Protein backbone atom coordinates (compact mmCIF):
# COMPACT_ATOMS: atom_id res chain seq x y z
CA UNK A 1 0.00 0.00 0.00
CA UNK A 2 1.21 3.50 -0.83
CA UNK A 3 1.64 5.61 2.28
CA UNK A 4 0.73 9.29 2.53
CA UNK A 5 4.18 10.82 3.02
CA UNK A 6 2.85 14.33 3.68
CA UNK A 7 0.57 13.08 6.42
CA UNK A 8 3.14 10.73 7.95
CA UNK A 9 5.87 13.37 7.88
CA UNK A 10 3.61 16.02 9.41
CA UNK A 11 3.06 13.57 12.26
CA UNK A 12 6.74 12.61 12.51
CA UNK A 13 7.89 16.26 12.48
CA UNK A 14 5.13 17.67 14.70
CA UNK A 15 7.58 18.32 17.57
CA UNK A 16 10.70 19.09 15.52
CA UNK A 17 12.38 22.44 16.12
CA UNK A 18 13.53 22.72 12.48
CA UNK A 19 10.08 21.83 11.16
CA UNK A 20 10.64 22.70 7.47
CA UNK A 21 13.94 20.84 7.33
CA UNK A 22 12.42 17.87 9.13
CA UNK A 23 9.59 17.74 6.59
CA UNK A 24 12.00 18.00 3.66
CA UNK A 25 14.21 15.13 4.77
CA UNK A 26 11.35 13.01 6.04
CA UNK A 27 9.74 13.44 2.61
CA UNK A 28 12.88 12.31 0.78
CA UNK A 29 13.24 9.30 3.09
CA UNK A 30 9.56 8.40 2.86
CA UNK A 31 9.68 8.47 -0.96
CA UNK A 32 12.68 6.12 -0.92
CA UNK A 33 11.57 3.80 1.86
CA UNK A 34 7.74 3.94 1.76
CA UNK A 35 7.89 3.94 5.55
CA UNK A 36 8.02 6.53 8.34
CA UNK A 37 8.63 5.29 11.90
CA UNK A 38 5.81 5.72 14.43
CA UNK A 39 5.94 8.54 16.97
CA UNK A 40 7.88 11.80 16.66
CA UNK A 41 11.36 10.30 17.24
CA UNK A 42 13.07 6.94 17.54
CA UNK A 43 11.22 3.68 16.73
CA UNK A 44 13.50 3.33 13.71
CA UNK A 45 13.62 -0.47 14.02
CA UNK A 46 10.17 -0.40 12.36
CA UNK A 47 11.69 1.15 9.21
CA UNK A 48 15.24 -0.18 8.67
CA UNK A 49 15.53 1.55 5.29
CA UNK A 50 14.60 4.90 6.89
CA UNK A 51 17.01 4.30 9.77
CA UNK A 52 19.94 3.37 7.50
CA UNK A 53 19.87 6.22 4.96
CA UNK A 54 22.95 8.41 5.48
CA UNK A 55 23.69 12.01 4.57
CA UNK A 56 26.91 13.12 2.85
CA UNK A 57 28.66 13.37 6.23
CA UNK A 58 27.72 9.81 7.20
CA UNK A 59 25.10 10.86 9.74
CA UNK A 60 21.44 9.92 9.80
CA UNK A 61 19.60 11.50 6.89
CA UNK A 62 16.08 10.83 8.14
CA UNK A 63 14.47 12.62 11.09
Swiss-Prot record:
Keywords annotated in UniProt: Allergen
**In the UniProt record, does the keyword Amino-acid biosynthesis occur?**
no
Q: In which tissues is it expressed?
A: Expressed in pollen (at protein level).
Record keyword Transcription present: no
Q: What InterPro entries does UniProt report for this protein, alphabetically?
A: GASA
Task: Classify the source by domain of life.
Answer: Eukaryota
Q: Which Pfam families match?
A: GASA (PF02704)
Q: What is this protein called?
A: Cypmaclein
Which organism was this protein described from? Cupressus sempervirens (Italian cypress)
Supply the source organism's classification: Eukaryota, Viridiplantae, Streptophyta, Embryophyta, Tracheophyta
Amino acid sequence: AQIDCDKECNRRCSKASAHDRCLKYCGICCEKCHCVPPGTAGNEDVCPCYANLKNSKGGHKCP
